[in-house]
């Protein structure tokens, strides 16, 4: 009986740790996207603001860098 209770407690602790790690990774991903800009917005890859997922920063004329949609090429 003690063995069963010990295994249940151990399983609960492992599950809680896995959930905490998943939540932490999700928050880090969200924080990384928080300061991003969308299509045709000014960007600066080296210092920010950075383009959101699915966009890339292109600089045709130096200070005028803008985010363009990533076509996957």
UniProtKB/Swiss-Prot annotation:
Tissue spec. comment: Expressed by the venom gland.
Modified residues (Serine amide): 71
Superkingdom classification of source: Eukaryota
Gene Ontology terms, MF aspect: sodium channel regulator activity; toxin activity
Signal peptide stretch: 1-20
UniProt keyword list: Amidation, Disulfide bond, Ion channel impairing toxin, Knottin, Neurotoxin, Presynaptic neurotoxin, Secreted, Signal, Toxin, Voltage-gated sodium channel impairing toxin
Entry GO terms, CC: extracellular region; host cell presynaptic membrane
Family of this protein: Belongs to the neurotoxin 07 (Beta/delta-agtx) family. 03 (aga-4) subfamily. Aga sub-subfamily.
Domain comment quoted from the record: The presence of a 'disulfide through disulfide knot' structurally defines this protein as a knottin.
Protein name, entry field: U3-agatoxin-Ao1i
Species this chain originates from: Agelena orientalis
